[in-house]
Structures are given as C-alpha cells and as structure tokens.
C-alpha cells in the first residue's frame, strides 16, 4: 500500500508540474517554462521507473489513468501555446529580414538622409 501511495504521489507531482507549465505558457513566461521543463522531465523519468513494477491494483490504475488524462490534456495545450509562440517568432524574424532588405536597398542611395523606419 505504501508503494501505491508513493506512486500516486509521484503522478500528482507530475500533474502539478504540468499545471504550472501550462500556466507559464498561458502567460507567455517562456524562460520559466523552459527552466521548469527540466524538473518535469526528471519527475516523469523517475515515475516511469517506479510505475513498471508497481501498478497492479485496478483502483490505483484508475486513479493514475485520471491523472494521466489531465497531464496529457495539459501537454496538448502547452504544445498548442508553444506552436503559437513559434509562429509569432517566425513572423517577427520575417518582418525583420524584410526590413533589413529595405534598409539595405535605400541605404545604397547617397542622397537618402534617412533609412526606412528611422526618424529625424
């Protein structure tokens, strides 16, 4: 029974970490999300090692199934938010590249006092 309680507690820790990661992704705190991800991955690895030998009780399996379902839902939402961020960063890189090309083009004309995007 103590092993089962320990396993349940490990899954709860993973769920708590995934909820924290989801919150960080929701508020776009990407640096903290990356930092927390290492802790999350270690917890998943440790729990996987425990789970292999411990999961025999049907009641425990159902409790773990519920936690896993929530963890997976959080993972899906985190990935969606990360993809949205990646798309936004790609758009910004594209805009920056286009702006640099325009500035280089207009910078070739010596009579141009200002480059596009500059103010007097």
From Swiss-Prot:
Q: Which GO terms describe its biological process?
A: bacterial-type flagellum organization; negative regulation of bacterial-type flagellum assembly; protein folding
Give me the ranges of the annotated region FliD binding: 60-98
- UniProt feature coiled coil, ranges: none
What Gene Ontology cellular-component terms does the record carry? cytosol
Q: Which Pfam families match?
A: FliT
Say which domain of life the source belongs to. Answer: Bacteria
Q: Region annotation Required for homodimerization: residue ranges?
A: 1-50
| Alphabetically ordered keywords of this record | Bacterial flagellum biogenesis, Chaperone, Cytoplasm, Repressor, Transcription, Transcription regulation
- Any idea what job this protein has? Dual-function protein that regulates the transcription of class 2 flagellar operons and that also acts as an export chaperone for the filament-capping protein FliD. As a transcriptional regulator, acts as an anti-FlhDC factor; it directly binds FlhC, thus inhibiting the binding of the FlhC/FlhD complex to class 2 promoters, resulting in decreased expression of class 2 flagellar operons. As a chaperone, effects FliD transition to the membrane by preventing its premature polymerization, and by directing it to the export apparatus.
Q: What name does this protein carry? A: Flagellar protein FliT
Q: Which organism is it from?
A: Yersinia pestis
